[in-house]
Amino acid sequence: MIGSYHDFHKTDKKERIVEILDAARTYDMTVGKYACMPETKEDVDTLLEATARMKEAYPEFPVITMAMGELGKPSRLYGGLYGSSLSFGCAREASAPGQVYYEEMISVFDKIYKGNHHISLIGFMGAGKSTVSRELKRLSGREEVDTDQWIEKHEKRSISDIFATEGEAYFRQCETDMLDELGTME
């Protein structure tokens, strides 16, 4: 479960951002997310510094941070260098100002992140992930992994059976295990 906080008007002080992300950890969320609207480049720096501080204090707790709008675009590209675990981009049309197009994102990621290993998580159930995934595979030439099929193969049962017999918490652990394994793929 993602403990998500958005401020569409401003960027909080560094200490407050860390406090918000730590609250997600304290409430036993799987991931903490903080998104803000920067007014200056210094606001983006504040966000990235808070991200680094949170990762330094709690390296085992994944966080996602981003500054919205055009001014926040660097946080979407370079947030991983400060400890943000995930970034959001778009394959075709941006759904929000500052979203980075896939080609630009991969070009930057290939230059600044060690290796050439990326996992793209796109959309919610019924949002067209399969269609987008096929397009990303075509654009990038990278392997496509259907996460539901992966879980069903490893669990030797359907997702609905997993939910019915084990519950959501078990399914979420299956997702986490899958991401851990996929993260080690060459």
Residues covered by each model-derived region:
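Catalytic alpha/beta core domains of metabolic enzymes, predominantly
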Residues: 1-115
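ATP-binding Walker
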Residues: 127
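Post-Walker A helix-loop "phosphate-sensing" segment adjacent to the P-loop in P-loop NTPases
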Residues: 138-149, 157
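ATP-dependent small-molecule kinase phosphotransfer cores
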Residues: 149-186
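P-loop (Walker A) phosphate-binding loop of NTP-binding proteins
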Residues: 124
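Hydrophobic anchor at the beta1->P-loop junction of P-loop NTPases
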Residues: 121
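Walker A/P-loop
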Residues: 130
